[in-house]
């Protein structure tokens, strides 16, 4: 095939060590794999922005799509091995840039990085090979700093974190276009009801600790076990004579954390208590409570740059989302007629026009992702020499293997309070296969039509402010392992399905965002509630701080308890003004009048029970949109369909044409 030399040009500014690179849909551009992307070289300085250029040989007359990104190209771990690429920012327009070269030589001036067709769309990168350490100081359970020295007991403190790693020799410093080692990065974030702030630098005396504010330090590194992290503590509200006579005014002490301490624990999350040493005498004057999480890249799976929906939401009318499929069948006032979180329940909601079906996912003992709402279930046991053969024992789902979940007689924990336990167990035993609880996530992905969206709630143990834990489980899986298994299952089996993750656990949301670049996540929050007990995590206590957290983590949006939205409807427009998508959930959403109000107020999605009570069997909005597109593109289809599309026409009516639409709503176009 005739070659064409294409010179790609982009303008933009970089941090020291960063490069611009291009990644696209052909071999020469890496086939969307950033590890095989082509780095651009600097041409000249054009004032505020530098021109970057790469000349690449493409096939003439063949259309190619591509995107630009900026990041680091690191030294290979082994001699002759592949280099590692860290993506800091990348272009995520729904339609990538494209070119069809028709000449032997061509120059493509793509203007400013991130701007395509006059629209700027950039997203942060994901973890490719680096590790992220998060250190947090907050008042969720108790004040993070405790001082024993009498004269400081009532003082307020400011904290500054200093990051130390291996020092580089001068010979190791290289130009930004050559492979190099990644320098450690530090970002400081302050999250509250009113705002969030992200900074790469700190004041000389750091930031103040406040009861209503979450302080977080994010460190990205290639050497997670080789860092020294130093907390310096400064007293606030100093008198003038103290300030004038001190080179470090108010500095009272220091606490040191070696990252190897975290690495050796083998845990993805935890709390460390560090001694604070006096500045002068080096005696212990108190302690600091440091909450941490470690986020590792997703192993065994490489995210590509073909598409991303992490921050994309198409403007539409509010979407109907089937809660646990066809609805709550265990704990609400009016129970669903189909058992919740089963394939039958999900299929029922889908057949009644649900745009998405919402369900809960966690792991069995042998690490199989299963769909089930509660963290515990009841195991049926038969007692010897007892006329009543049914005895129920509550057991965590995580203590049973997938095969045991399929074979043992299990029932919902509400059976413990049931007057007729035997009846509930018999009902479980006589269920049809699609009515069986605990289907695997893979089974659900394979069983339902691809044009039904999935809102996958990732279950995790939550602690209440009174100290109680969900299911009385104070320990759970390792968070990295837990999410790696669930995310890989989804990424490898999702096809073209629309997927939105959600979770009540803020750290789960953070990890999902950092581990993959394809699917969005919503932060679930109950806000201020008279129904549910307050949660321990400060980020979960109010809808405003949930918004700030979602902005800070660059999430798609929030999923708010309807009780809180009905009490504070202004939250809806406030969230939208901050660029967030907003869903709602809760029993109040089951009221059709509440749904009408919420839709008028602009909620993007409503999760509710028994969708079959309100909507007839019909295609969902995605199927209708697909059919409308086909009608516009294929005139022959118009004669086969009635003007008002309320459901798909059977393919038999289109017998005279080569075009038909399958009953499941997936278009099947032959010879068109």
Curated annotation (Swiss-Prot):
GO biological process: glycerophospholipid catabolic process; skeletal muscle tissue development
Phosphotyrosine PTM sites in chain numbering: 608
Domain CBM20: 1-115
Localization in the cell: Cytoplasm, Cytosol
InterPro entries per UniProt: Carb-bd-like_fold, CBM20, CBM20_GPCPD1, GDPD, GP_PDE_dom, Ig-like_fold, PLC-like_Pdiesterase_TIM-brl
GO MF term list: glycerophosphocholine phosphodiesterase activity; starch binding
Enzyme class: hydrolase
CDD domains recorded: CBM20_Prei4 (cd05814), GDPD_GDE5 (cd08607)
PROSITE patterns: CBM20, GP_PDE
Domain of life: Eukaryota
Binding site for substrate: 70, 88-89
GO cellular component term, pick one: cytosol
Residues passing through the membrane, by range: none
EC id: 3.1.4.2
Tissue expression profile of the protein: Widely expressed, with highest expression in spinal chord.
Residues with PTM Phosphoserine: 175, 424
Keywords: Cytoplasm, Hydrolase, Phosphoprotein
Catalysed reaction, written as an equation: sn-glycerol 3-phosphocholine + H2O = sn-glycerol 3-phosphate + choline + H(+)
SMART domains: CBM_2
Gene3D superfamilies noted in UniProt: Immunoglobulins (2.60.40.10), Phosphatidylinositol (PI) phosphodiesterase (3.20.20.190)
Domain GP-PDE: 318-618
Classification via PANTHER family: GLYCEROPHOSPHOCHOLINE PHOSPHODIESTERASE GPCPD1 (PTHR22958:SF1), GLYCEROPHOSPHORYL DIESTER PHOSPHODIESTERASE (PTHR22958)
Primary role: May be involved in the negative regulation of skeletal muscle differentiation, independently of its glycerophosphocholine phosphodiesterase activity.
Similarity comment text for this entry: Belongs to the glycerophosphoryl diester phosphodiesterase family.
Protein name, per record: Glycerophosphocholine phosphodiesterase GPCPD1
Species: Homo sapiens
Top-level taxonomy: Eukaryota, Metazoa, Chordata, Craniata, Vertebrata
Gene designation: GPCPD1
């Amino acid at each position: 095939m005739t070659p064409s030399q294409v010179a790609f040009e982009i303008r933009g500014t970089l941090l020291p060590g960063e490069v611009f690179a291009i990644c696209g849909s052909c071999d020469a551009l890496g086939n969307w794999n950033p590890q095989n992307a082509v780095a651009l070289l600097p041409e000249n300085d054009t004032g505020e922005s530098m021109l970057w250029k790469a000349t690449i040989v493409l096939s003439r007359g063949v259309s190619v799509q591509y995107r630009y990104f900026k990041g680091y190209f690191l030294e290979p771990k082994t001699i002759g091995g592949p280099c590692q690429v860290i993506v800091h920012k990348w272009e995520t327009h729904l339609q990538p840039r494209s070119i069809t070269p028709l000449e032997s030589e061509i120059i493509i001036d793509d203007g400013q990085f991130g701007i395509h067709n006059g629209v700027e769309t950039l997203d942060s990168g994901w973890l490719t090979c680096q590790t992220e350490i998060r250190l947090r100081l907050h008042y969720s359970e108790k004040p993070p700093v405790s001082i024993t020295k009498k004269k400081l007991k009532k003082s307020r403190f400011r904290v500054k974190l200093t990051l130390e790693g291996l020092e580089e020799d001068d010979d190791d410093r290289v130009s930004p276009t050559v492979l190099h080692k990644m320098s450690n990065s530090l970002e400081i974030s302050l999250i509250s009801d009113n705002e969030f702030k992200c900074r790469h630098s700190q004041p000389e005396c750091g930031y103040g600790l406040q009861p209503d504010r979450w302080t977080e330090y994010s460190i990205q590194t290639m050497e997670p076990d080789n860092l020294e992290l130093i907390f310096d503590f400064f007293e606030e509200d100093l008198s003038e004579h103290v300030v004038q006579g001190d080179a470090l005014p108010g500095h009272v002490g220091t606490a040191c954390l070696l990252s190897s301490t975290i690495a050796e624990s083998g845990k993805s999350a935890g709390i460390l208590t560090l001694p604070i040493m006096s500045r002068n005498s080096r005696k212990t004057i108190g302690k600091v409570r440091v909450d941490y999480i470690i986020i590792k890249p997703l192993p065994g799976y490489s995210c590509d740059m073909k598409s991303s929906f992490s921050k994309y939401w198409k403007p539409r009318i509010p979407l109907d989302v089937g809660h646990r499929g066809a609805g709550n069948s265990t704990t609400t006032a009016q129970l669903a007629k189909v058992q919740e979180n089963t394939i039958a329940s999900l299929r029922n909601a889908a057949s009644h026009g649900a745009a998405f079906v919402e369900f809960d996912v966690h792991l069995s003992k042998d690490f199989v992702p299963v769909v089930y709402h509660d963290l515990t279930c009841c195991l049926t046991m038969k007692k010897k020499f007892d006329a009543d053969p049914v005895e129920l024992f509550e057991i965590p789902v995580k203590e049973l293997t997938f095969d045991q979940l399929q074979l043992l007689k299990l029932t919902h924990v509400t059976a413990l309070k049931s007057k007729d336990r035997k009846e509930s167990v018999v009902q479980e035993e006589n269920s049809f296969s699609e009515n069986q609880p605990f289907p695997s996530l893979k089974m659900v992905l394979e069983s339902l039509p691809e044009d039904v969206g999935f809102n996958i709630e990732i279950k995790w143990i939550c602690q209440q402010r009174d100290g109680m834990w969900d299911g009385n489980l104070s320990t759970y899986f390792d968070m990295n392992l837990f999410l790696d298994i669930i995310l890989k299952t989804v990424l490898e089996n999702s096809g073209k399905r629309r997927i939105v993750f959600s979770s009540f656990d803020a750290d789960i949301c953070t990890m999902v965002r950092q581990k993959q670049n394809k699917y969005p996540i919503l932060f679930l929050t109950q806000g201020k509630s008279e129904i549910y007990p307050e949660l321990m995590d400060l980020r979960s206590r109010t809808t405003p701080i949930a918004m700030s957290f979602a902005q800070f983590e660059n999430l798609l949006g929030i999923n708010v308890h309807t009780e809180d939205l009905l009490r504070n409807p202004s939250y809806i427009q406030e969230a939208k003004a901050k660029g967030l998508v907003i869903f709602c959930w809760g029993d109040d959403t089951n009221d059709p009048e509440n749904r009408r109000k919420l839709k008028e107020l602009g909620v993007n999605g409503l999760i509710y029970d028994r969708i079959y009570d309100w909507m007839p069997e019909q295609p969902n909005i995605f199927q209708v949109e697909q059919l409308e597109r086909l009608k516009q593109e294929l005139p022959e289809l118009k004669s086969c369909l009635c003007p008002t599309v309320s459901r798909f026409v059977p393919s038999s009516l289109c017998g005279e044409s080569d075009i038909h639409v399958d009953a499941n709503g997936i278009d099947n176009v032959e010879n068109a």
